[in-house]
Amino acid sequence: ENNCYLSHCYFGKRIRRWNEAAKMYYYDRGFCANPDETDRTFSLDTMPGEYPDFGQGDFRSPAMELEFQDGDRNTRFHYAGYQISAGKLSPEKLPHVYVESDKEAMTLEIWMKDEVRGLRLSLYYTIYEDAVLTRFVSIKNESEDIVKIHRLLSMSLDLGEQDYDILTLGGAHTEEKN
């Protein structure tokens, strides 16, 4: 939304028409950190962040933590573009689900860039005919610097307060509960 930060406004069952009720509202955020000191109505700490990075005033757990050669860990990824394609893109050399035809799925790829550090982050969302969503992330270092990855999650899901039921399926290697 603001300054090319990526947020989401809905996560749930399929919707036929967009409803403005889920849009983000701007009002004075009080003591929240603001990326723009002249705008008190926007804070990363209160925005439903799609893929939060480290050190920018969002005090929730980040989806990624990187360390640069100078010891700095701050990143500042901004929205850079997107592409929608038929079928499913697959992470290289990693297990994944497959489709037999490109008609079975659609993939959204969102690009984020950290211009200061020379990094490109790609977020992949594949939705299947049966309303299943899969996600993965890739990062590309376009600089000459060495970057150490401490944390790089496939997704971050920032849900508002509601009465949720949580189901967890514990297991171990070859003993998964499914």
Please annotate each region the language model reported.
Residues 3-178:
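Polysaccharide-binding surfaces and accessory modules of carbohydrate-active proteins
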